């Protein structure tokens, strides 16, 4: 077993303290020590955890009460009916096994997420071993190893930095911050500093974008920050979706109802009618078969699958089927900021030049020195395909130049760079020197306004250079402050001309400068995101932002998107540091007042999601980074990003946006609401039929009739009803579906008038079937009892089958007339009804089938009676719907 590693607060300690704590030095470890530590601590990789066998996953699918009752019914059918009941049993068991196989297919997402985490790791690291730089498999790194870093590297383990030469590391996947972090060894950090502020640390799987560094490995494997997230993923409790909760509730209700009714029926058969135990048991089994909609699990699966196909065409890839319906229940959309609500691409938004603040969309003159400086003092590379490679801030400046028709590659041909002073975190400046055609040199300097303004002695306005005044400086500082309030990252541009290449010292190169301008940049919101937020609010959904980025940036983007009111001066931002001060109970009391959470860790995100879930809300969480994975898994529906998202976040999600478009979520919510509405229709359709079947058998038992046989019920439930039920699952959305409030976690399939419809429509079907059965007995066309009984049995069976087909039209809407919702809008429905009719008729007219189904040939008169009986189903339901609309029940159900 691997030795436990310390997860100390290394960022609060000096380099010397950390080296001492890790038993290391700047010379690195010896090979012997490294080998011993590898044996002690284990490899630098993530644990896979104990994997369940395929058989265990398969057996887990049979824990549902309804499935157990179905299996019991199949076994009892064989016991009581022998070979005659074998066909019924095989049909039931086939449905059960197919459903279980699909359930197994849906499992295993946590393992996939952890595998993706493993694949992100850097394969090779450069470490100091035996006082030499050697390439080491990153999985063989151990605590105490000294590792070298340079631009382009993936950080192979968590480490405390010992050297940082202009080192910048992009940590967006861990922190959500879109700008690479300038690493600073001199920083003194508090114990509660969030990951994004730990500027003297480098974390596994982060990307080195600039400079060089040296660090001592502090943690490997599952003890790294990424490993910590992997552990959270593996141990996360997945929340049952509202659909699963509803299906579980439905299973329990049906199961208990079946047991009670079967017991009562058996008691009546034995004690009232004096039947033997075996015949009574056969009747009870028939009733169980009638009561349980055997095809429901499979039909729900098919409806959800069809929903996934619709969503796939609209850029939403569903990874877990129940997520389709969960979308429709969503009450809270907790969105990550970077890459989800924003473009994850730094962009120039404002330029202050010639004493004026202009929008980036306005055209600048190609000779504008601000434009020249931002492109000259820049290390961005352009690959052959035109892709910009480098620090996101610098690539934003070059992209702005290209948008202004200023191609720095062309300009540098005539004004080549001949010297430079690289950026470092102490000066916070970068300077380059460029040869001019006249023989002199142009010095371009960019950097932090507070550092650069002190080195400026002149200012340029419209081509004229003059001494800078205090009033000029106040105007520059005021503009800088105004841009910073908008959460823009501000850089200052300055320059000077010199006669010779200066001595490359900061005091020489970066003094006596001419102020040129300010540039304000931000990772901007997606163009369609604000409209999506508005539509979400209109649909009764509350969008909130959860990000690891800075408070001011988060608040500014949230106001621009409408997540919080731009005119409201109250503090709407809650930080991770503040959250650390609260217990879960304390946070539960205040969380509702905040719409934006900034500077939060993965644990914080999970706490926020759980707080909303504890309040009974259905939560959708979006994200694209490694840091989002635990909360994606905890949420009712985790939504990953297909383009910018890490494989880890995709693996932990239920749904992936193929276009990374926040607005696509709203489209998916509409589809989800439609899917739930259609599943409701399917359940209403099936359960009203099952109610009728149960009542028919129960009443037949009570009065000594023989109305329907188990094979009739199985054929209707599994074959005749299945096609219309599936077709109802793809009905078009009813008008106004996105103006309703979300149905919420605690609503059921029986809400909105569905339960009352199931009851009265089930009773109505029973009355019509028994009415036709009674007619056949009262007005027989034969004199022999067996033939009379065969006709009555056949007419009852045909009437029930036809009622199911016409009733499918009734179920298109709970309250609206079938003639207003549209008879022929659903193409699948249009052909499913006649096809189901042919399947029903096949059992009567196809030779061989009639004997198997125990039916007789009906006369024209008998056919007319069955058609009238089934047709009355539509007439009566239409009358009831008309009365309900007059009473306003349709409006109350919304």
Language-model features, listed with the residues they occupy:
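Alpha-helical transmembrane segments of multi-pass integral membrane proteins
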Residues: 757-772
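Conserved cytosolic headpiece of P-type ATPases
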Residues: 1-742, 747-750, 763, 778, ...
């Amino acid at each position: 077993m691997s030795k436990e590693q310390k997860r100390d607060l290394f960022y609060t300690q000096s380099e010397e303290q950390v080296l001492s704590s890790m038993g290391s030095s700047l010379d690195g470890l010896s090979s012997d020590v490294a080998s011993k530590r590898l044996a002690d601590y284990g490899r630098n990789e993530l644990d896979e955890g104990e994997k369940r066998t395929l058989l265990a996953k398969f057996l887990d699918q049979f824990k549902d009460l309804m499935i157990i009752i179905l299996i019991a019914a199949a076994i009892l059918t064989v016991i009581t009916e022998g070979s005659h009941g074998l066909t019924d049993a095989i049909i039931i068991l086939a449905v059960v096994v197919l459903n279980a196989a699909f359930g197994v297919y849906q499992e295993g997402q946590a393992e996939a997420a952890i595998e993706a985490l493993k694949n992100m790791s850097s394969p090779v690291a450069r470490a100091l071993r035996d006082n030499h730089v050697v390439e080491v498999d990153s999985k063989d790194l151990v605590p105490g190893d000294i590792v070298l870093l340079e631009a382009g590297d993936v950080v192979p383990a968590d480490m405390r930095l010992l050297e940082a030469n202009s080192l910048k590391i992009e940590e967006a996947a861990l922190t959500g911050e879109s700008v690479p972090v300038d690493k600073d060894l001199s920083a003194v950090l508090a114990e509660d500093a969030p990951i994004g502020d730990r500027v003297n640390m480098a974390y596994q799987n982060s990307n080195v974008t600039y400079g060089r560094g040296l660090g001592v490995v502090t943690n490997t494997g599952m003890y790294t920050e990424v490993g910590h997230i992997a552990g959270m993923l593996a141990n996360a409790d997945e929340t049952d979706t509202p659909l699963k909760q509803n299906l579980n509730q439905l299973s329990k209700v049906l199961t208990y109802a079946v047991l009670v009714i079967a017991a009562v029926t058996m008691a009546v058969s034995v004690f009232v009618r004096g039947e033997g135990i075996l015949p009574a048991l056969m009747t009870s089994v028939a009733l169980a078969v009638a009561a349980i909609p055997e095809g429901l699990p499979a039909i729900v699966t098919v409806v959800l699958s069809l929903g996934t196909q619709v969503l796939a065409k609209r850029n939403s890839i569903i990874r877990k089927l129940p997520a389709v319906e969960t979308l429709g229940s969503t009450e809270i959309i907790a969105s990550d900021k970077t890459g989800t609500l924003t473009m994850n691409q730094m962009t120039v938004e404002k330029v202050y030049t010639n004493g004026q603040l202009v929008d980036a969309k306005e055209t600048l003159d190609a000779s504008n020195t601000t434009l020249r400086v931002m492109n000259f003092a820049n290390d961005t590379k352009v690959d052959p395909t035109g892709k910009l490679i480098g620090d996101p801030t610098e690539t934003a400046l070059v992209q702005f130049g290209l948008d202004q028709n200023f191609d720095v590659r062309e300009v540098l041909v005539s004004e080549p760079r001949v010297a430079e002073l690289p950026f470092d975190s102490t000066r916070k400046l970068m300077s380059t020197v460029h040869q001019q055609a006249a023989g002199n040199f142009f010095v371009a300097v960019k950097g932090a306004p507070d550092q650069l303004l002190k080195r400026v002695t002149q200012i340029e306005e419209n081509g004229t250079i003059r001494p800078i005044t205090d009033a000029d400086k106040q105007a520059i500082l005021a503009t800088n402050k105004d841009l910073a309030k908008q959460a823009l990252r501000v850089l200052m541009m300055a320059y000077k001309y010199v006669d010779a290449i200066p001595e490359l010292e900061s005091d020489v190169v970066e003094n006596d400068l001419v102020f040129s301008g300010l540039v304000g940049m931000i990772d901007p919101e997606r163009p369609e995101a604000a409209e999506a937020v508005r539509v979400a609010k209109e649909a009764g959904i509350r969008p909130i932002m959860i990000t690891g980025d800075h408070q001011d940036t988060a608040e500014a983007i949230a106001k621009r998107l409408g997540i919080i009111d731009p005119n409201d001066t109250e503090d709407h931002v809650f930080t991770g540091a503040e959250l650390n001060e609260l217990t879960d109970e304390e946070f539960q009391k205040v969380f509702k007042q905040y719409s934006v959470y900034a500077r939060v860790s993965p644990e914080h995100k999970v706490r926020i999601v759980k707080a909303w879930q504890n309040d009974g809300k259905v939560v959708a969480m979006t994200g694209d980074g490694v840091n989002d994975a635990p909360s994606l898994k905890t949420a009712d529906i985790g939504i990953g990003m297909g383009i910018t998202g890490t494989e880890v976040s995709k693996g932990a999600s239920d749904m992936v946006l193929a276009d990374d478009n926040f607005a696509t979520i709203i489209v998916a919510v509409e589809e989800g609401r439609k899917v739930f509405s259609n599943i409701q229709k399917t359940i209403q359709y099936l359960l009203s039929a099952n109610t009728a079947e149960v009542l028919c058998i129960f009443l037949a038992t009570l009065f000594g009739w023989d109305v329907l046989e188990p094979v009739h019920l199985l054929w209707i439930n599994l074959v005749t009803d299945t096609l219309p039920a599936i077709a109802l699952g793809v009905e078009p959305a009813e008008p106004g579906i996105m103006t309703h409030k979300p149905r919420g976690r605690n609503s059921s399939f029986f809400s909105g008038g569905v339960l009352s419809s199931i009851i009265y429509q089930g009773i109505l079907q029973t009355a019509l079937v028994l009415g036709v059965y009674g007619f056949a007995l009262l007005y027989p066309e034969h004199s022999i009892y067996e033939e009379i009984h065969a006709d009555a049995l056949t007419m009852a069976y045909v009437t029930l089958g036809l009622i199911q087909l016409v009733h499918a039209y009734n179920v298109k809407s709970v309250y609206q007339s079938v003639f207003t919702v549209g008879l022929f809008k659903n193409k699948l429905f249009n052909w499913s009804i006649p096809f189901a009719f042919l399947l029903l008729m096949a059992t009567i007219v196809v030779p061989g089938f009639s004997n198997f189904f125990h039916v007789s040939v009906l006369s024209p008169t008998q056919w007319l009676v069955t058609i009238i009986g089934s047709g009355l189903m539509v007439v009566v339901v239409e009358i009831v719907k008309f009365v309900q609309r007059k009473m306003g029940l349709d409006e109350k159900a919304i």
